[in-house]
Swiss-Prot record:
GO cellular component entries: cytoplasm
Keyword Amino-acid biosynthesis: yes
Subunit structure: Heterotetramer of two alpha and two beta chains.
CDD domains cross-referenced by the UniProt entry: OAT (cd02152)
Gene3D superfamilies (alphabetical): ArgJ beta chain, C-terminal domain, L-amino peptidase D-ALA esterase/amidase
Job of this protein: Catalyzes two activities which are involved in the cyclic version of arginine biosynthesis: the synthesis of N-acetylglutamate from glutamate and acetyl-CoA as the acetyl donor, and of ornithine by transacetylation between N(2)-acetylornithine and glutamate.
Gene Ontology molecular functions: glutamate N-acetyltransferase activity; L-glutamate N-acetyltransferase activity
Name the UniProt record assigns to this protein: Arginine biosynthesis bifunctional protein ArgJ
Localization terms from the record: Cytoplasm
Residues with site note (Involved in the stabilization of negative charge on the oxyanion by the formation of the oxyanion hole): 101-102
Pathway(s): Amino-acid biosynthesis; L-arginine biosynthesis; L-ornithine and N-acetyl-L-glutamate from L-glutamate and N(2)-acetyl-L-ornithine (cyclic): step 1/1; Amino-acid biosynthesis; L-arginine biosynthesis; N(2)-acetyl-L-ornithine from L-glutamate: step 1/4
Active site: 171 (nucleophile)
Length: 379
């Protein structure tokens, strides 16, 4: 199921080298959540302004240039992107959502965007190929486009994101479309909760982008129960978050940190995020080194209420190796190493003896290729 399987969604895109441009025609209700970085890209500011009344008729996206830290010129360029799309789509400028991703601090090549936008518009359609072209247009260092859907709730989403990913949200753009009928206020409430339970639990490298944008758009053609929709939206976002971790720049392994028995959920999530964000843990995962001391240390500095009564295990989804039992090391490092070498996905499970709090985070290993990719990013 592609985004073009949602009735009323037409899209297209073009990719030339590092630069891409995507366009969507869609009329409906819209909600968005955006970066928590204090340095906010121009398209984030403009997009927030434009979707404030909850109505959308189009989306325009460019990749290769973030249009961030570009001052007043950046704001003018973001608004011009909306104006270009509006003129093509035959709608008001304020009905266009805009997003950008790429290198920070460089001016947009507006001449290229002006030239390519009519070409993209002329190819708008609802085919699988249209959806694929839009997906390719929005990626940067991604190895693949992230996609997920729910037939049950009539949701389809497409996203990009591979590096500069850390709570809150991750460098990510995500565009989710649904034919389920909800107003913008309902969409926002469900979007905010779903993003918090998924994207805000994801960390690749500890950096938070200036451009994070997640948009949820409803064409309002079908009735879906709200509880069902929100549960399915979480599932769609969880799938995309896992794909982002799998595609973390240079990543070879994805892992989840699951915590229970914490004093409360807040503490559990603090611990999970600290472990998932730890560079020492990430490099240990890459090296298949069951150095559980790094995990314990991260739990200890997380800010949560922690003591030595921790039970720690590693699992590949089939087999589980316990390394610590209620504070007592078990000497199972070699068994854990063998499990890590075979696994593509791991679960690090920490059980505390503080209460009933539960939490989780998603991460990936940190490899030599991550350094190489990011050392050469702007060259």
């Amino acid at each position: 199921m592609e985004i073009t399987d949602i009735g009323g969604v037409l899209c297209n895109g073009i990719k030339e080298g590092k630069y891409g441009l995507g366009l969507v025609r869609v009329r409906g209700s819209i909600a968005g959540v955006f970066t928590q970085n204090k340095i906010r890209a121009a398209p984030v500011i403009v997009c927030e302004e434009n979707i404030r009344d909850g109505v959308v008729e189009g989306v325009i996206v460019n990749s290769g240039n973030a249009n961030a830290y570009t001052g007043e010129q950046g704001m003018r360029d973001a608004r011009e992107m909306c104006r270009i799309a509006a003129n093509l789509l035959g709608c008001e400028e304020r009905r266009v959502a805009v997003a950008s991703t790429g290198v920070i601090g460089r001016k947009l090549d507006m001449e290229w965007i002006r030239k390519k936008a009519p070409e993209v518009y002329s190819g708008l359609g609802n085919s699988v190929e249209n959806a694929e072209r839009f997906g390719r247009a929005i990626v940067t260092t991604d190895r693949f486009v992230k996609k997920a859907y729910s037939e049950k709730a009539r949701i389809a989403a497409v996203a990009k994101g591979a590096g500069m990913i850390a709570p809150n949200m991750a460098t990510m753009l995500c565009f989710a479309f649904t034919s389920a009928k909800f107003d913008s206020g309902e969409l926002y409430d469900m979007l905010r909760r779903a993003a918090d339970k998924t994207f805000n639990r994801l960390t690749v490298d500890g950096d938070t982008s200036t451009n994070d944008t997640v948009l949820l758009i409803s064409t309002g053609k079908e009735r879906v129960e709200r509880d069902v929709f929100e549960e399915e939206l979480c599932s769609v976002f969880y799938s995309i978050a896992k794909q982002m971790a799998r595609d973390g720049e240079g990543a070879t392994k994805v892992f989840e940190v699951r915590v229970d028995g914490a004093r409360n959920d807040e503490d559990a999530n603090l611990i999970a995020r600290a472990v998932a964000s730890s560079l020492l843990v990430k490099t240990a995962i890459f090296g298949c080194d069951p150095n559980w001391g790094r995990i314990i240390a991260a739990a200890g500095y997380s800010g949560a209420d922690v003591d030595e009564r921790i039970t720690l295990s590693l699992s590949d989804g089939r087999d589980e190796v316990f390394l610590i039992d209620s504070g007592r090391p078990l000497g199972n490092e070699e068994r854990a190493r063998v499990l890590m070498e075979k696994a593509e996905e791991l679960v690090i499970r920490l059980r505390l003896e503080k209460g009933n709090g539960k939490g989780f985070a998603i991460g990936c290993d940190l490899t030599y290729d991550y350094v190489k990719l990011n050392a050469e990013y702007t060259t």
